[in-house]
Amino acid sequence: MLMLLMMILTNNKVFMETLYYYLMFNFQLMSPFGVPVPGPAPETKDIKNLYESIMNNYINILNKYTININKDNINKLKFLDNYTEEEKGYYLSGLFEGDGNIYTRCFSITFSLEDVLLANYLCTYFKIGHITAKYNFNKELTAVKWNIMKKKEQEVFMNYINGKLLTYKRYDQYFKYNFNNRLNIKLLKPKEFDLTLNPWLTGFNDADGYFYTGFQKHKNSQWLKFHLELSQKDSYILDIIKKYFKTGGILKRDYKSGATAYIYKAQSSKAMKPFIEYFNNYQPLSTRRYKQYLLLNIAYLLKLNKLHMLTNSLLMLKELMLLQSVKNMSLEMKNELNNRVKIIINKTHYNNIE
């Protein structure tokens, strides 16, 4: 079926390139001819190979349109190997405060299916925990969880994040489920710290953030827009981000359901400058956020150099946006993704058996 679709659309170059890169770089599941890629379950190096492929893909598109901008910050990769032990703790703390939880016996962090390689990377790198599947009411696979259940491994994790919590939510859960007596660790109270000096925000943004790049149109005009967005139920974390980055704004949004959300946005070249500098130093480790950030970084550099409205720049940006916008997956692709997730789950479960 996929092969037939590709044959029908061979004259649409942009679509073909988009489909090819989507299959190869977003999921690493299939060859260009629709044949499942054989091989062992992903190891730590797989996420690095994936990021290098994504980066090279973006640079190739830049070169294709002969866009002359400084590629130094687009052309480098930074992983946990490049972090100090202290920085690793800040990244884990931000991720844990964003999408983590503490239960009766378990520490857990949830990841989207697209970030299954990140979950596996962290599990393998730190050699703690295992990966499990998360299903919806229709028994469809929707996410994966990195679960840490062994006492010694929980102590390793808590030693990394101890003294690096910004909020009381995980701190309160730690005492609620009696981990203060079960683990040989005195958990320090959360405290405010300078977010610009460590990768806490990278971890938190990997969990809860969003980089947007797009065109806004009005009548016969269009202009390039990009921003960083974070949404929370209260404004505490957002206020701290605004305080230390000295930019952006916070909006309060009330919904008909009675819920309230606070939304932080930095949405101009001037507002994004400190974030560009920060994320160039502490790059996103989430596959989704990394792709979003590469696109935003390119858009930012184009606008900074007043190249963003040139014909070649517009065509290039639209191709990159199309590359990111492909969301619909065939049943075959979904099955391949599910199989990859199951391989990782089985592998980490086997490695976790004492």
Swiss-Prot record:
Any Gene Ontology biological process: intron homing
Main location as per UniProt: mitochondrion
SUPFAM superfamilies cross-referenced by the UniProt entry: Homing endonucleases (SSF55608)
InterPro entries: Homing_endonucl (IPR027434), LAGLIDADG_dom (IPR004860), LAGLIDADG_Endonuclease (IPR051289)
PANTHER family, A to Z: INTRON-ENCODED DNA ENDONUCLEASE AI5 BETA, INTRON-ENCODED ENDONUCLEASE AI3-RELATED
A molecular-function term among this protein's GO annotations: endonuclease activity
The protein's Enzyme Commission number: 3.1.-.-
Record has Transmembrane as a keyword: no
Family: Belongs to the LAGLIDADG endonuclease family.
Short name of one Pfam family: LAGLIDADG_1
A GO CC term assigned to this protein in UniProt: mitochondrion
UniProt keyword annotation of Phosphoprotein present: no
Stated name of the protein: Intron-encoded DNA endonuclease aI5 beta
Gene: AI5_BETA
